[in-house]
């Protein structure tokens, strides 16, 4: 009997996984949540719309937002992406969580990077 290749998600090649992650970062998701820690160490989560450009994730955060206040204390963030729920068992639906440190950039509407970010921003269905 020949060896049969199992094509489930657990046996994907690194190239396939990299492509799926890249697709998610480029906008193939339904929801995205940013997580920061408040001054008491509690997680604070809210929906966000990241901008993905040149292999970097950019977030537009108001100086008045709770996340901005939290990031003054702790630069650690988590970003959670959820794709369309296609499986009956909800825990089996595609998702991606990224952890990292955030860096603040001061941009205004006339900055070239800001214009490029908006130009490359993908709107979803």
Where are these predicted regions, by residue range?
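Binding-site signature for planar aromatic cofactors or substrates
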Residues: 1-125
């Amino acid at each position: 009997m020949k060896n049969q290749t199992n094509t489930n998600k657990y046996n994907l090649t690194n190239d396939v996984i990299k492509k799926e992650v890249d697709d998610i970062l480029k906008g193939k998701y339904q929801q995205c949540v940013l997580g920061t820690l408040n001054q008491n160490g509690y997680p604070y989560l809210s929906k966000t719309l990241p901008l993905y450009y040149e292999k970097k994730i950019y977030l537009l955060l108001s100086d008045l937002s709770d996340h901005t206040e939290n990031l003054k204390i702790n630069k650690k963030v988590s970003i959670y992406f959820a794709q369309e729920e296609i499986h009956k068992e909800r825990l089996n639906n595609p998702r991606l969580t990224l952890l990292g440190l955030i860096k603040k950039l001061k941009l205004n509407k006339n900055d070239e990077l800001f214009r490029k970010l908006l130009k490359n921003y993908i709107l979803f269905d």
